[in-house]
């Protein structure tokens, strides 16, 4: 299932427009150095807020990566507040060069959204995992399983954007938000989820299958 083409995330438009405006003003003033600097800034903001098409696997039981990046944690944990009991946790770290638009990992209905204020430690640190600001989306899949995916702020990424509301029905691969300037997304899954990835694997939001919700 191919998602519609949206070249940049809507949250990026003001940044891109402002950088482009400064480029034009500098060019009109014939200031070559500033024009070059602001042109680079415009190119960077375009690159950072890019939102490319993704080919979403047409498999209702497939768990799809919600973020671009690298898997840094796979573990079982009971230290979480999103789904009952022990959960299988997958953490995906996004660096500043990754696409930062997040996507739904599976189809379902949003039960609740839990925003937790916090710190801004490095997102790939143990402190960041425990104390950083985050926004958790808890949903019930179409097969009746409870899962959660959590947008986590980071040292540079201090702006979490979530486009969902409770009771929203979402399709797998749908754009659901973004985190500005690099951070992480944590998944909390049933412990019987059959994974097909390992720590260190690089993944793409909306395309990479992480496993199957049994």
From Swiss-Prot:
UniProtKB keywords: Cell membrane, Decarboxylase, Lipid biosynthesis, Lipid metabolism, Lyase, Membrane, Phospholipid biosynthesis, Phospholipid metabolism, Pyruvate, Zymogen
UniProt subcellular location: Cell membrane
GO molecular function: phosphatidylserine decarboxylase activity
Signal peptide segment: none
GO terms under cellular component: plasma membrane
UniProt pathway: Phospholipid metabolism; phosphatidylethanolamine biosynthesis; phosphatidylethanolamine from CDP-diacylglycerol: step 2/2
Main location: membrane
Pfam families hit by this protein: PS_Dcarbxylase
Active site per database record: 183 (schiff-base intermediate with substrate)
Cofactor: how and how many bound: Binds 1 pyruvoyl group covalently per subunit.
Topology relative to the membrane: Peripheral membrane protein
Co-factor requirement: pyruvate
Swiss-Prot/TrEMBL site (Cleavage (non-hydrolytic)) positions: 182-183
PTMs per UniProt: Is synthesized initially as an inactive proenzyme. Formation of the active enzyme involves a self-maturation process in which the active site pyruvoyl group is generated from an internal serine residue via an autocatalytic post-translational modification. Two non-identical subunits are generated from the proenzyme in this reaction, and the pyruvate is formed at the N-terminus of the alpha chain, which is derived from the carboxyl end of the proenzyme.
Residue positions where Pyruvic acid (Ser) is found in the record: 183
Reactions that this protein is recorded to catalyse: a 1,2-diacyl-sn-glycero-3-phospho-L-serine + H(+) = a 1,2-diacyl-sn-glycero-3-phosphoethanolamine + CO2
E.C. number(s) listed in UniProt: 4.1.1.65
GO biological process entries: phosphatidylethanolamine biosynthetic process
Functional summary from the UniProt entry: Catalyzes the formation of phosphatidylethanolamine (PtdEtn) from phosphatidylserine (PtdSer).
Entry's family note: Belongs to the phosphatidylserine decarboxylase family. PSD-A subfamily.
Subunit architecture: Heterodimer of a large membrane-associated beta subunit and a small pyruvoyl-containing alpha subunit.
Protein name per Swiss-Prot or TrEMBL: Phosphatidylserine decarboxylase proenzyme
Organism: Desulfotalea psychrophila (strain LSv54 / DSM 12343)
Record gene name: psd
């Amino acid at each position: 299932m191919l998602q519609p083409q949206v070249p940049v995330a809507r949250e990026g438009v003001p940044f891109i427009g402002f950088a482009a405006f400064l480029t034009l003003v500098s060019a009109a003033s014939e200031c070559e150095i500033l024009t070059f600097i602001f042109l680079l800034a415009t190119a960077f903001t375009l690159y950072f807020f890019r939102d490319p098409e993704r080919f979403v696997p047409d498999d209702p039981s497939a768990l799809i990566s919600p973020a671009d990046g690298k898997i840094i944690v796979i573990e079982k944990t009971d230290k979480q507040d999103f789904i009952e009991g022990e959960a299988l946790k997958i953490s995906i770290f996004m660096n500043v060069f990754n696409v930062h638009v997040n996507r739904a990992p599976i189809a379902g209905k949003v039960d609740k959204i839990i925003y937790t204020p916090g710190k801004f430690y490095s997102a790939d640190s143990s402190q960041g995992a425990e104390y950083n600001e985050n926004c958790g989306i808890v949903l019930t899949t179409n097969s009746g399983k409870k899962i959660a995916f959590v947008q986590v702020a980071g040292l540079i990424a201090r702006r979490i954007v979530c486009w969902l509301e409770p009771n929203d029905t979402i399709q797998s691969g749908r754009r659901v938000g973004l985190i500005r300037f690099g951070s992480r997304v944590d998944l909390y899954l049933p412990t019987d989820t059959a994974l097909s990835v390992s720590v260190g694997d690089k993944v793409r939001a909306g395309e990479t299958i992480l496993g199957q919700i049994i």
